[in-house]
Amino acid sequence: MKYLCLAYGDEAGWNALNDNEKQELLANDRVIRDRGNLVTAVKPQVTAVRNWDKNLKVTEGTDEHHGLPLAGFSIIEAENVEEVIDLVANTPCARANGVIEIRPFWNLEN
């Protein structure tokens, strides 16, 4: 099954880590790729489009509407949600005062 993992966090949490902690967390990201679980991920560039009341607003960067900005997302293939939790629990956003939302995809092939 494939799972969408939304990563929320900000640079302050990341910058608060020492270099060894950062390297350890980035190594955990590499494990997900090396195991073949990572399906895809996005680049950090963001363009936000908002069209409230037919008033189009396009901005470079996140259009923050809550406490933490969306830092990125990935699509991970795993046997179950517990495996995904194990994979993402020690990634940068999960550890640097952020949060990762895990959402399973519908199986639309049947």
Q: Where are the language model's segments positioned?
A:
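Conserved, structured core segments of small domains
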Residues: M1-N110
